[in-house]
Amino acid sequence: MIADIINPATLGFILVAVMLFAIFVGFPISFTLIFLGFVFGYLGFGPLVFYLMTLQFSMVMTEQALAAVPLFVFMGIMMEQAGLMERLFSSVQLMLARVRGSLYYAVLFVSVIFAAATGIVGASVTILGIMAAKSMNKSKYDVRLAAGTITAGGTLGILIPPSIMLVVMGPIMEIPVTDLFAAAIIPGILLALLYAGYTTLRCWQNPSLGPVLPEEMRATSMKQVWIEFFLGLVPPAALVFAALGSILFGFATPTEAAGCGAMGAMLLALAYKKLTFNKLQEALVKTLEITALIMVLVAASNFFGSVFSRLGTPMVLTDFLLGLEVNKYFILFIVMAMIFLLGWPLEWVPIVLIIIPIILPLIESLGFNLTWFAILVAVNLQTAWLSPPVALSAYFLKGVVPEWDLKDIYIGMMQFMVLQIVGLILIIIFPQLVLWLPTLIYGQ
C-alpha cells in the first residue's frame, strides 16, 4: 500500500492540491471529488474506502434537514415564475415615489424579501436587474450606485434565512439549522441598513444620484397606494415571514415550514392568476435540477472530507498552526482571506462543502463559536461576490442590463464591498450581533 511509503497526512495534502487544480481547470466538481476521494482513499487505507463512500452517500440522502432544500428552492422559483417579486417592487415603488432615492430603497426592500424566498444569488440579482434597471434608467438614476445597490441586495440571498446555503451548512458543521437562521437575521438586517444608509447619504450629498420619480411613475391617488400595499406587498412578505417565524419560534421544523412555504407560493400564484401548467412544470424541473446538483455535491464532498480526515491531514494542519503561537485572530484572518480569495472564482457550494470541513477542526481547536464562524463565512462569501476581478454578480447584472457598462457596474459594486467589510469587522468585534438572538430564542 502506498501509505507505507508516503505518510498518509502528506497524501492528504497532495489530495487537496490535485482537487483544487482539477476544479480550477474546469473538471465537474462532484465527479472530481468522488474520483479523487476514491483513488486517494484506496491508496491510503485500502478497501475500506468502498464502505466509506456508501456510508457517506447514504447519510446525506437520509438527512432530514436537507429535505428542506427542494421545498425552499421550489418556493422561490414559484414566486419568481408567478411575478410576485415584480408586483412587490411596483408596490414599494409607488409608496415611496415622492422620496428621493426611492428606487434604491425599493430594491433593497425587495431584495430582503426575495433573498429570504430564494436564497439563490444569481436569481436575485437577475430578477432585481430586470425589475429595477428600466425604472432607474427612466428616472435618470446614477448607474454606478444603481448597479451597486442591485448586486449588493442580490447577494443577501446567501445570508438572510431561509438561505439555502445555511440549510446545507448546518449538517456539514453539525449546527442546528434553526440556530443558523436565528444567527443570520441581525447581520442580514445590519448589512441592509448599511446599504440604505449609504444610499441615503449619497443622495443627500448629491440629489441628482436619485431624483424624485416623475409624475407618470407615481400613484394617482392614495387609494391606489393602499390597494398596491395590500395586494402587492402584504401577501408575499407575509408568506416569507410566516415560513421563517414558524421555524424560529419552534412551531415547525425547517422542512415543515419549507413545505408550507412551497404550498403558499402556489396558492399566491393561483390567487394572482399566474399559475399555469407550463409554469408549474418549469418550476418543478428547475427545482429538480438545482436539488440534484446540491445533493450530489453534498454527498460527494462528505465522502471527500471523510477520506481527507481519515488520512489525518486536518490534525497535522491544526497542530502546525496552533504550534506557531500566534494570536488566534491572526489565524482567523488567514482563514477568512483564503475563503475570500476562493470566493472569487467559485460558487459557495464547493467552498462550504469542501473547504469548511477541512478547516473546521482548526476553528474548534481555537475555541471560536461555530455558529458565529458560519455567519462570518456567509458574509465573507457575500463580499467575494462583490469583488473584482471575477465578481459573478456583475456578469449576472450585465446579462440582463446590457446597456450598463461593466466598468460602471464594477465601480458601483466596490462601494458596497467596502460596506461588506465594515459589516464583517463589526461582526468580528461584536459577536453578540450573531449570538444574541439564538441565545434569546433557544437559550443556548
Describe the role of every protein-language-model region.
Residues 6-12, 25, 61-67, 94-106, ...:
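Membrane-interfacial loop-to-helix junctions in multi-pass transporters
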Residues 40, 127-139, 169-182, 311, ...:
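Membrane-interfacial helix-loop connectors
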Residues 4, 172, 179-290, 395-415, ...:
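Long, contiguous bundles of hydrophobic transmembrane helices that form the permeation core
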Residues 55-59, 87-98, 127-138, 147, ...:
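Short amphipathic alpha-helical coupling elements at transmembrane boundaries
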Residues 93-168, 348-377:
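Hydrophobic transmembrane alpha-helices that form the pore/transport pathway of multi-pass ion
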Residues 20-29, 76-80, 110-122, 150-158, ...:
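Transmembrane alpha-helix interface/packing and boundary motifs in multi-pass membrane proteins
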Residues 9-20, 25-45, 67-74, 189-195, ...:
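Hydrophobic mid-bilayer segments of alpha-helices in multi-pass membrane transport proteins
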Residues 24, 31-34, 60-86, 112, ...:
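Core transmembrane alpha-helical segments of multi-pass membrane transporters/permeases
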